[in-house]
UniProtKB/Swiss-Prot annotation:
Lineage: Bacteria, Bacillati, Bacillota, Bacilli, Bacillales
Molecular function as annotated in GO: damaged DNA binding; DNA-directed DNA polymerase activity
InterPro entries: DNA/RNA_pol_sf, DNA_pol_Y-fam_lit_finger_sf, DNA_pol_Y-fam_little_finger, DNA_polymerase-Y, IMS_HHH_1, Rev_trsase/Diguanyl_cyclase, UmuC
Record's protein name: DNA repair protein homolog YobH
Species per Swiss-Prot/TrEMBL record: Bacillus subtilis (strain 168)
SUPFAM superfamilies (UniProt xref): DNA/RNA polymerases, Lesion bypass DNA polymerase (Y-family), little finger domain
Amino acid sequence: MAKAIQSSMWREFGLMCTVGIGDNMLLSKLALDLESKKTKSGIARWRYEDVPNRLWKVRPLSKMWGIGGRMERNLNRMGISTVGQLAKFPLELLEKKFGIMGNQLYYHAHGIDLSEIGAPLMQGQISFGKSQILFRDYTKREEIKAVLLEICEEVARRARTYNKVGRTISLGIGYSKDELGGGFHRSKTIDFPTNITMDIYKCCLMFFNKFYSGKKQ
């Protein structure tokens, strides 16, 4: 399939391309960024079992997707200079320091990405979430709003599937590595429980309009 994509790109557009393949979107992105461009075939594949030998050796930390220069400096001050050290750092301390971004950093360091289907439903779980990796920088507000709407629809759909409603809505946005990372995370508890897409979207849009700094996503 990867070779077929490369052949199609060359045949239709005259462009050579590299391909990253992984057990999830994160690993495929890392395979693309960190290895595929160095191979003769332009193709690289990363599996979960490759994480200790490939991902954990990555340094500086800013080579890791989602870690900008500012975040790298913060982690360095905590004694973390490799992805392996990040993976072994206590999750609760990362969450205390960075909030939801700390949670994402920890699981990404283990090669775990929940962006496609959200967190697995556990016994007694009463929350639904979805994160999404953007494979290019988004700078236009209307583009970002479209992505937000898609995410809200997925979360609302899952809530409706399980016949659940919720009152607390959270939105976290991380900025591009070109912007030295960073971002924001905000939560709000609304008056009435909902699983309606537009109710969730309006709340997230309020966060976006109030806290988005105009940096690349």
